[in-house]
């Protein structure tokens, strides 16, 4: 299959707001893909490289060669080149990687260059989410969507499921079963406004758990063998020996469990998320165990000693979890129908330094790989009034509109602004239309000449965010987590915006 076919389908999917149209377009593409290309195409259209990371970002793509006149690149050839770029290391690797990248882009047409750029920078915003992609695979293979979704849930690898479905149909999907040692797509949570909202949505009674600001891990044990996977299903077993040790101490033979790994201070309060995250990076590992040990807290059980629990109600899974794990290695928990008791638990959890609570149905099954209605997260909302420093032209449905806004806090010391991140979340169609007009008026230079449009720092926007994290990308050393637009504040001048000192105060008190 030619790359131009994938790029064209991606553009069509991005331009459509209709779910069924997206599914039909992707399914049509998958039917035409060769069996060796299916998994690659599904990965790319899901916004992922099969290699995950190959060391290419926006900085590497600021200047690319002129586009080719005719499409010649195949999916297999581009995949091979991605692998070669990712494998480039050692002395002179930066120059070699740049040359390989230039060679690739010089062979790509304009539409292919656009697709490659967005794929490599994680900006492939086309609405081909996992649910859409799974349904497209089902349509292409003429299989029930539920069958494909369950295989993807158990296999934790939709591209592999797609390849099996398109090649061998039902028989191909039979290989995807729950097995210790084989990562499963984790169940995800929806959001509730507060604990009362959570209780209402869960039928009046809920199990509330402390939501730790650590790293979610899926722990597998087969006899004396332990495997640990991240939320994105990366194998990090070798980096977490203390979690392996804790798992081997449990009185079980086989197990698949959901847990949180977190770095704690001597007083039991959590370190900042970055301290925990440092153990999961490329440079993290066993050498950090003594200075930065992780504690493990289990919160769900998917399988134990030959018994699959995915379809069991939550109260049964938790009862089995409690039977095989010590109190000290389980998250704090409260089952209640009393909003007052739930709020007290929420407040106590925040006071302990954690980021919020999870509210869970006591009767819901474990919906692996899905954002199930049986799990709701409740977190405090922070807001800041920040100033827009620049805006990026959108793509897909947002093509022709100024979309992603760069956010800065006021610096009283210099009179300037310190960038804290960027977001396009929370924007309605009406807001996009308004801000396009507004920022074109504020543009500092030719707004059509660059992907990023610098603007005069005059527009104040109210931003909600979940917290702050350490960042080397921005000069203030901090970045907003999960920022989204609440509203534009035309009643405020840039001099009324929150200062970088205010942001630091939030950061220092643990968000």
Curated annotation (Swiss-Prot):
Taxonomy of the source species: Bacteria, Bacillati, Actinomycetota, Actinomycetes, Mycobacteriales
Catalytic reactions on record: ATP + (deoxyribonucleotide)n-3'-hydroxyl + 5'-phospho-(deoxyribonucleotide)m = (deoxyribonucleotide)n+m + AMP + diphosphate
Record family assignment: Belongs to the ATP-dependent DNA ligase family.
Enzyme Commission number(s): 6.5.1.1
A GO term, aspect molecular function: metal ion binding
Role according to the record: DNA ligase that seals nicks in double-stranded DNA during DNA replication, DNA recombination and DNA repair.
Top-level taxon of the source organism: Bacteria
Active site (catalytic residues): 211
Keyword Transit peptide belongs to the record: no
Name of this chain's protein: Probable DNA ligase
Record-listed ATP binding positions: 209, 216, 231, 260, 299, 371, 377
Keywords: ATP-binding, Cell cycle, Cell division, DNA damage, DNA recombination, DNA repair, DNA replication, Ligase, Magnesium, Metal-binding, Nucleotide-binding
Gene giving rise to this polypeptide: lig
Alphabetized InterPro entries for the sequence: ATP-dep_DNA_ligase (IPR050191), DNA_ligae_ATP-dep_bac/arc (IPR022865), DNA_ligase_ATP-dep (IPR000977), DNA_ligase_ATP-dep_C (IPR012309), DNA_ligase_ATP-dep_cent (IPR012310), DNA_ligase_ATP-dep_CS (IPR016059), DNA_ligase_ATP-dep_N (IPR012308), DNA_ligase_N_sf (IPR036599)
Cofactor(s) the protein requires to work: Mg(2+)
Gene3D superfamilies xrefs: DNA ligase, ATP-dependent, N-terminal domain (1.10.3260.10), DNA ligase/mRNA capping enzyme (3.30.470.30), Nucleic acid-binding proteins (2.40.50.140)
Biological process according to GO: cell division; DNA biosynthetic process; DNA recombination; DNA repair; DNA replication
């Amino acid at each position: 299959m030619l790359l131009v076919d994938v790029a064209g389908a991606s553009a069509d999917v991005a331009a459509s707001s209709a779910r069924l149209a997206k599914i039909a377009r992707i399914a049509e593409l998958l039917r035409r893909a060769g069996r060796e290309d299916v998994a690659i195409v599904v990965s790319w259209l899901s916004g992922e490289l099969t290699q995950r990371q190959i060391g290419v970002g926006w900085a590497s793509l600021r200047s690319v060669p002129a586009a080719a006149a005719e499409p010649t690149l195949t999916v297999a050839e581009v995949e091979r080149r991605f692998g070669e770029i990712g494998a480039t290391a050692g002395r002179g690797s930066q120059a070699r990687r740049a040359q390989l990248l230039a060679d690739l882009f010089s062979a790509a047409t304009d539409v292919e260059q656009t697709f490659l750029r967005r794929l490599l920078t994680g900006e492939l915003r086309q609405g081909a989410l996992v649910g859409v992609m799974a349904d497209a695979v089902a349509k292409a293979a003429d299989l029930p969507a539920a069958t494909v979704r369950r295989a993807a849930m158990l296999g934790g690898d939709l591209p592999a499921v797609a390849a099996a479905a398109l090649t061998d149909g039902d028989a191909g999907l039979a290989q995807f079963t729950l097995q210790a040692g084989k990562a499963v797509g984790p169940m995800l949570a929806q959001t509730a406004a507060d604990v009362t909202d959570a209780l209402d949505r869960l039928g009046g009674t809920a199990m509330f758990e402390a939501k730790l600001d650590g790293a979610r891990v899926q722990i597998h044990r087969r006899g004396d063998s332990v495997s640990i996977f991240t939320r994105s299903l990366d194998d990090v077993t070798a980096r977490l020996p203390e979690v392996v040790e804790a798992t081997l101490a449990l009185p079980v033979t086989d197990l698949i469990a959901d847990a949180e790994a977190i770095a704690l201070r001597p007083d039991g309060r959590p370190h900042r998320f970055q301290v925990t995250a440092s153990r999961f990076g490329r440079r993290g590992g066993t050498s950090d165990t003594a200075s930065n040990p992780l504690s493990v807290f289990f919160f769900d059980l998917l399988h134990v000693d030959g018994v699959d629990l995915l379809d069991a109600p939550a109260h049964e899974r938790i009862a089995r979890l409690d039977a095989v794990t010590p109190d000290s290695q389980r998250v704090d928990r409260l089952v209640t129908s009393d909003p007052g008791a739930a709020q007290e638990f929420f407040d106590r959890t925040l006071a302990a330094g954690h980021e919020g609570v999870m509210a869970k149905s006591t009767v819901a099954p474990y919906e692996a790989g899905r954002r199930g209605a049986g799990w709701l997260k409740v977190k405090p909302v922070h807001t800041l009034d920040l100033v827009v420093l620049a805006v990026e032209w959108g793509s897909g449905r947002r093509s022709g509109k100024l979309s992603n806004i760069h956010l800065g806090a006021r610096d009283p010391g210099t009179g300037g602004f310190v960038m804290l991140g960027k977001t396009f979340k929370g924007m309605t169609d009406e807001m996009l239309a308004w801000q396009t007009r507004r920022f074109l008026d504020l543009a500092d230079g030719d707004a059509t000449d660059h992907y990023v449009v610098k603007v005069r720092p005059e527009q104040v926007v109210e931003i909600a965010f979940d917290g702050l994290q350490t960042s080397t990308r921005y000069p203030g050393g901090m970045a907003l987590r999960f920022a989204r637009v609440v509203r534009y504040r035309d009643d405020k001048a840039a001099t009324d915006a929150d200062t970088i000192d205010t942001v630091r105060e939030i950061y220092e008190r643990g968000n």
